From Swiss-Prot:
The keyword tRNA processing does not apply. Subunit 8, of the mitochondrial membrane ATP synthase complex (F(1)F(0) ATP synthase or Complex V) that produces ATP from ADP in the presence of a proton gradient across the membrane which is generated by electron transport complexes of the respiratory chain. ATP synthase complex consist of a soluble F(1) head domain - the catalytic core - and a membrane F(1) domain - the membrane proton channel. These two domains are linked by a central stalk rotating inside the F(1) region and a stationary peripheral stalk. The gene is MT-ATP8. Component of the ATP synthase complex composed at least of ATP5F1A/subunit alpha, ATP5F1B/subunit beta, ATP5MC1/subunit c (homooctomer), MT-ATP6/subunit a, MT-ATP8/subunit 8, ATP5ME/subunit e, ATP5MF/subunit f, ATP5MG/subunit g, ATP5MK/subunit k, ATP5MJ/subunit j, ATP5F1C/subunit gamma, ATP5F1D/subunit delta, ATP5F1E/subunit epsilon, ATP5PF/subunit F6, ATP5PB/subunit b, ATP5PD/subunit d, ATP5PO/subunit OSCP. The keyword Cytoplasm does not apply. GO terms for biological process: proton motive force-driven ATP synthesis. It is a single-pass membrane protein. It comes from Guira guira. Keywords: ATP synthesis, CF(0), Hydrogen ion transport, Ion transport, Membrane, Mitochondrion, Transmembrane, Transmembrane helix, Transport. This is ATP synthase F(0) complex subunit 8. It comes from the Eukaryota. GO terms for cellular component: mitochondrial membrane; proton-transporting ATP synthase complex. It holds the Pfam family ATP-synt_8. Belongs to the ATPase protein 8 family.
């Protein structure tokens, strides 16, 4: 069964991961986000309790 022979497939997988980690990932991480995250205010609004008709 040729699928069980790891010789060509392991090298292909290793090459793919190294390409992703060393070339593609730094390029993707260098982009500036268009909507940078902002801290939300610590003001917490309390919602009123719901009055259930059967209680």
């Amino acid at each position: 069964m040729p699928q069980l022979n790891p010789n060509p497939w392991f090298f292909t997988m290793l090459t793919t991961w190294l390409t992703f980690l060393l070339l593609i990932q730094p390029k993707l991480l260098s982009f500036i986000m268009t909507n940078p995250p902002i801290n939300k205010s610590s003001k917490h609004t309390k919602t009123p309790s719901w009055t259930w008709p059967w209680t």
